[in-house]
């Protein structure tokens, strides 16, 4: 890129390089695809199906239980204390509270299960649950992906 500097009237050459994001995008797409398969594994329904309660959605409803599938990729948010998480700075804890609130506001007592693919993510949430930092009303289940 060329541009005239008003200070010295000289032409400056600035090079601009576009970063190669294909590897990042490919890796993210692979995780998203695996998570869709994981959701289907956990819910036994097509990935595009959701079960809505108020303004929140669950991945499925099975045997009288609202089901959410927490696939791969959450460990990085735990390691950074949920900053920059798609779930907000409160992370999955805030997300869980929103889901519980929606069920309670609907006047329901339907149980909620979270199936968690990553063992480290499961362990973190389980420990938070034991210490009262994660809602005890949500049953946490470690379900490894097929």
Task: Name each model-derived stretch.
Residues 1-146:
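Catalytic toxin/effector domains delivered as secreted proteins or via bacterial secretion systems
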């Amino acid at each position: 890129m060329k541009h005239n500097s008003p200070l010295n009237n000289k032409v400056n050459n600035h090079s601009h390089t576009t970063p190669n994001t294909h590897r990042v995008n490919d890796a993210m797409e692979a995780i998203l695809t695996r998570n869709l398969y994981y959701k289907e594994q956990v819910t036994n329904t097509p990935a595009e199906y959701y079960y809505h309660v108020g303004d929140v959605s669950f991945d499925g409803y099975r045997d009288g239980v609202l089901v959410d599938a927490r696939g791969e990729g959450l460990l990085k948010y735990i390691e950074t204390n949920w900053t920059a998480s798609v779930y907000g700075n409160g992370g999955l804890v805030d997300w869980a509270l929103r889901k519980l609130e929606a069920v309670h506001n609907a006047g329901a007592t339907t149980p909620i299960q979270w199936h968690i693919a990553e063992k480290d993510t499961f362990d973190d949430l389980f420990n938070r649950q034991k210490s009262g930092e994660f809602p005890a009303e949500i049953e946490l289940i470690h379900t490894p992906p097929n």
